[in-house]
């Protein structure tokens, strides 16, 4: 990763470098310049989530794109995967998403999709980053008669809803199915309720009144307490929790228990395998996936590949290895037969299809995978030296791995978006897992905290 781009685009506190108006302006210019073609005016989709800072960044990107001769198309508030879909379906040259996903409202971010609906590669982002940082974009602007014009597209919601509904098998019906939904006061606040209502669900929606500063606030995929309680109160079949930009899903079963992304992978993988649609019998997960996923894959005859953390790396390995299903424990799930990126609403639709096809409640399907106790501790760090160059940390990891044997595992890695080191330990019990996780975290903190 470079100076600006992390594992999921550019992130930072809004109205502060690098997530300020001058930077957004420069990114708009750089993307337009890189994508410029002979006799073709670059067309770029711009969408956002519900953060108050989205207006500023949207305007700055628009100015940068038009100043470099491109035509921006504004779609307003739309989930990240919706922007990827619109970019590809409109044959635009790129799509820019203004969002910081599950982060609090103070943060914002910029991520970019290519014209094919896939996120840009590291190499493409590096070219854009170098243009932004060399300070010479002003020398590359066209004359006034070649400046671009902004447009607004008003029917994107309907287009995206039709796409989502078409992924639900026609022989199935959600008619009368009780569903509770938490949109995190985020980008799914309109499209998710409308999609499920049109599919016939009996819907109860919470945390669905965005005001610019309540996105992800004690709600959504990171905070399912309210959703779990409401599902039980309403006697619902399932609860659906999206994050701020709508690219991930955490589900809740009818008993009010949380279902992770790993469990969703196993449930949907078994459904696809039963239909002969799980290409190469392969699931792509990440190194952070629960050990229970590996055990379940062996039990049901799936092959499993662990990618680096980040949905972009999951996708890259899916394409390289020929897989149609992959994802992360956090709820990013990619159905490559349907979409180019993780989509929380699409994932919810597929999960409900698996429930209806099996005739089983979600609590029973969740038992397809035994979840190993897992503890994650995040440590703020001043720098990010290679873990292998820290002998005391390496030794601490070896000691714990030796103690756990085949009853658990250890992972120490840096965050791709924050100055943070993550220590994850899985083991046979909560007590042992917490003990060993704290043991390693203390060593990491002493070394680089």
From Swiss-Prot:
Q: Which cofactor does it need?
A: Mg(2+)
What positions does the entry give for Mg(2+) binding? 101, 243, 245, 247
Where in the sequence is Phosphoserine found? Answer: 101
Q: Which catalytic reaction applies to this protein?
A: alpha-D-glucosamine 1-phosphate = D-glucosamine 6-phosphate
Q: Which UniProt keywords apply?
A: Isomerase, Magnesium, Metal-binding, Phosphoprotein
As to how many cofactors bind and how, the note says:
Binds 1 Mg(2+) ion per subunit.
* GO terms under biological process: carbohydrate metabolic process; peptidoglycan biosynthetic process; UDP-N-acetylglucosamine biosynthetic process
Give the active-site positions.
101
State the function annotated in the UniProt record. Catalyzes the conversion of glucosamine-6-phosphate to glucosamine-1-phosphate.
* Protein name, entry field: Phosphoglucosamine mutase
Its gene name is glmM
């Amino acid at each position: 990763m470079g100076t600006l781009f992390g594992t999921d685009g550019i992130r930072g506190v809004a109205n502060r470098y690098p997530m300020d108006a001058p930077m957004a302006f420069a990114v708009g210019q750089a993307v337009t310049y890189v994508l410029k073609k002979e006799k073709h005016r670059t067309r770029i989709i711009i969408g956002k989530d519900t953060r108050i800072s989205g207006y500023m960044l949207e305007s700055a990107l628009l100015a940068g794109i038009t100043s470099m001769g491109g035509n921006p198309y504004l779609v307003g508030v739309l989930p990240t995967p919706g922007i990827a879909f619109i970019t590809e379906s409109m044959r635009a040259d790129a799509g820019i998403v203004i969002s910081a996903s599950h982060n609090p409202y103070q943060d914002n971010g910029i991520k970019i999709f290519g014209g094919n609906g896939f996120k840009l590669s590291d190499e493409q982002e590096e070219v854009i980053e170098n243009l932004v940082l060399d300070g010479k974009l002003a020398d590359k602007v066209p004359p006034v008669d070649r400046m671009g014009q902004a447009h607004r597209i008003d029917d994107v919601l309907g287009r995206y809803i039709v796409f989502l509904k078409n992924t639900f098998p026609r022989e199935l019906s959600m008619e009368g199915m009780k569903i509770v939904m938490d949109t995190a006061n985020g980008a799914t606040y309109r499209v998710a309720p409308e999609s499920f209502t049109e599919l016939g669900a009996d819907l109860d929606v919470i945390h669905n009144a965005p005001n610019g500063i309540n996105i992800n606030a004690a709600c959504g995929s990171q905070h399912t307490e309210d959703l779990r309680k409401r599902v039980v109160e309403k006697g619902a079949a399932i609860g659906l929790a999206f994050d701020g930009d709508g690219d991930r899903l955490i589900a809740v079963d009818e008993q009010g228990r949380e279902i992770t992304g790993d469990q969703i992978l196993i449930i949907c993988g078994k459904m696809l395998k039963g239909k002969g649609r799980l290409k190469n019998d392969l699931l792509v997960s990440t190194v952070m996936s629960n050990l229970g996923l590996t055990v379940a894959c062996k039990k049901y005859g799936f092959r499993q590949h662990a990618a680096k953390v980040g949905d972009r790396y999951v996708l890259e390995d899916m394409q390289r290895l020929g897989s149609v299903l992959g994802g992360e424990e956090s709820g990013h799930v990619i159905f490559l037969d349907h979409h180019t990126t993780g989509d929380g609403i699409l994932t919810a639709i597929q999960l409900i299809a698996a429930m209806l096809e099996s005739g089983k409640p979600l609590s029973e399907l969740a038992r397809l995978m035994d979840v190993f106790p897992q503890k994650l501790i995040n440590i703020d760090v001043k720098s990010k030296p290679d873990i292998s160059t820290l002998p005391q940390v390496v030794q601490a990891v070896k000691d714990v791995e030796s103690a756990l044997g085949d009853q658990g595992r250890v992972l120490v890695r840096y965050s791709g978006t924050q100055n943070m080191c993550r220590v994850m330990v899985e083991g046979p019990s909560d007590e042992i897992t917490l003990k060993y996780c704290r043991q390693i975290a203390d060593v990491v903190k002493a070394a680089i905290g």
